[in-house]
Amino acid sequence: MLQISHISKTFNPGTVNEKKALNGVDLHLNSGDFVTILGSNGAGKSTLFGAIAGSFVVDEGTIRLDGQNITSLPDYKRSKFIGRLFQDPLKGTAPSMTIEENLALAYLRASEKRSPFSVVTAKDRAGFREKLAQLELGLEDRMDHPVGLLSGGQRQALTLLMATLVTPKLLLLDEHTAALDPATAEKVLALTKKIVAENHITCLMITHNIPSALSLGNRTIM
């Protein structure tokens, strides 16, 4: 499903700030895998996610997804089939736009049958409301509220929904509960487990929480 072969990346080569972030990394995921990644800060975990998502082009090696070579594919094209959540709840949503508008953007971006000029229909809105209700956060009754008014946990739950609104081939979770309080983090992790399982999503999750890594993943990499 995901085949990463000997990828390497050096930032600022030839300068005093040169940093070898990835060095001959190999990784293989089967369809439906939930793989968790544990490691110290600066070990290159987030850089690996950046390489997969297309945030930059690797210096060498290949990345294949469902047999397609995506090594040189730009990030905006990969976003149609790769979902990603960051540690910071402020990333992944547009704070000045409403909940409905954020969901509409995510839906239109990921849906291959839509163009950027497509219009969200009443049926689409009903679908958004139904999905929001499944979060059990009351957001289905606040669709016209700006996202900037939501708590960190609510925003992260919304971002999770946006990333999976159209089922991605691969979901990248980059310590997506690290900035939340323990109770909220547990709720978001439970939502993550539910959404991933129900939609049979292949998932990679970075975490420093060993119990979460062992309970959620069918394989853990250190």
Where are these predicted regions, by residue range?
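A short, flexible loop at the N-terminus of ABC-type nucleotide-binding domains that lies
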Residues: M1, T10-G24, P74
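ABC ATPase NBD coupling module
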Residues: T15, N69-G83, K91, R114, ...
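The feature captures the beta-strand-to-loop junction immediately N-terminal to the Walker
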Residues: L38-S40
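Helix-to-loop junction immediately C-terminal to a conserved catalytic motif
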Residues: A53
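Conserved ABC transporter NBD signature motif
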Residues: G61-N69
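ABC ATPase C-loop
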Residues: A163-T164
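Walker B catalytic motif
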Residues: E175-H176
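H-loop/switch region of ABC-family ATPase nucleotide-binding domains
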Residues: T207-H208
